[in-house]
Curated annotation (Swiss-Prot):
It comes from the Bacteria. Belongs to the SmpB family. Required for rescue of stalled ribosomes mediated by trans-translation. Binds to transfer-messenger RNA (tmRNA), required for stable association of tmRNA with ribosomes. tmRNA and SmpB together mimic tRNA shape, replacing the anticodon stem-loop with SmpB. tmRNA is encoded by the ssrA gene; the 2 termini fold to resemble tRNA(Ala) and it encodes a 'tag peptide', a short internal open reading frame. During trans-translation Ala-aminoacylated tmRNA acts like a tRNA, entering the A-site of stalled ribosomes, displacing the stalled mRNA. PROSITE patterns: SSRP. It holds the Pfam family SmpB. GO terms for molecular function: RNA binding. One of its GO terms (biological process) is trans-translation. Keywords: Cytoplasm, RNA-binding. It comes from Coxiella burnetii (strain RSA 331 / Henzerling II). It is found in: Cytoplasm. This is SsrA-binding protein. One of its GO terms (cellular component) is cytosol.
Amino acid sequence: MNKQISKKPAQRTIALNKKALHDYYVEQRFEAGLVLEGWEVKSIRAGRVQLRDSYVVFKGGEAWLIGAHLSPLPNVAEYMKADPQRSRKLLLNKPEIGKLFGAVQKQGLTVVPLDLHWHKNHVKVEIALAKGKKTHDKRETIKRREWEREKHRVLKSHG
């Protein structure tokens, strides 16, 4: 018997930024590579990553991920100065950087990371052009989500 091999790209999620989906309306998503050091890759493999308060800034025509926390493993060499909060360069094409930068400058949008995942053997970050939610919008989203959950619960019990 032959086993079917799926043609889907292997994509395993490492870390999610749930706060970004709560605080922003996502307009458009992009996938970017990250410039990492060796100890950072090991920390990512161990799952020691947090994207909660991170965001993207543009300096000198390049995109940088700020505020992502990668905790170093306890066995990182002592001669290295492991900085868990350092700025990490994002690898994007020039047209993508131009589009993101233009939207941030002209429309007042924000670029936030949504998740960190493996794509084949590379660490990728999914970033999004996003518009901030007001407090009443956040409450409305929560009400809508709870109503959907309650509706499914009732249909399941009576169905």
